[in-house]
Amino acid sequence: MPLTVKCPICKTPVEWAPQSEFKPFCSERCKLIDLGDWASEKHAIPVKSEFDLDALDEFDLDEDAFFKE
């Protein structure tokens, strides 16, 4: 029995099988809607900042004198 999932866009059941051309989407239309959502940044993967913004004050980087010659 093949696995069935819901299309992330319209919730139509989709068979998860090699012949399912647009899986996990039910159609090219739903696939393109999802792509458009990513392109317009409606979806985003949360990212942890490389820098600890609280630690910047430790080096007085927010002081005006730091940026003056």
From Swiss-Prot:
Please tell me where Zn(2+) binds in this chain.
Answer: C7, C10, C26, C30
Pfam families with a match to the protein in the record: YacG
Cofactor binding mode, per the note? Binds 1 zinc ion.
Task: List the Gene3D superfamilies.
Answer: Erythroid Transcription Factor GATA-1, subunit A (3.30.50.10)
Q: Does the keyword Zinc apply?
A: yes
Q: Which GO terms describe its molecular function?
A: DNA topoisomerase type II (double strand cut, ATP-hydrolyzing) inhibitor activity; zinc ion binding
Can you supply a Gene Ontology BP term from the record?
regulation of DNA-templated transcription
Quaternary structure (record): Interacts with GyrB.
Q: What is this protein called?
A: DNA gyrase inhibitor YacG
Organism, by scientific name, is: Shewanella putrefaciens (strain CN-32 / ATCC BAA-453)
Q: What is the lineage of its organism?
A: Bacteria, Pseudomonadati, Pseudomonadota, Gammaproteobacteria, Alteromonadales
State which gene encodes it. Answer: yacG
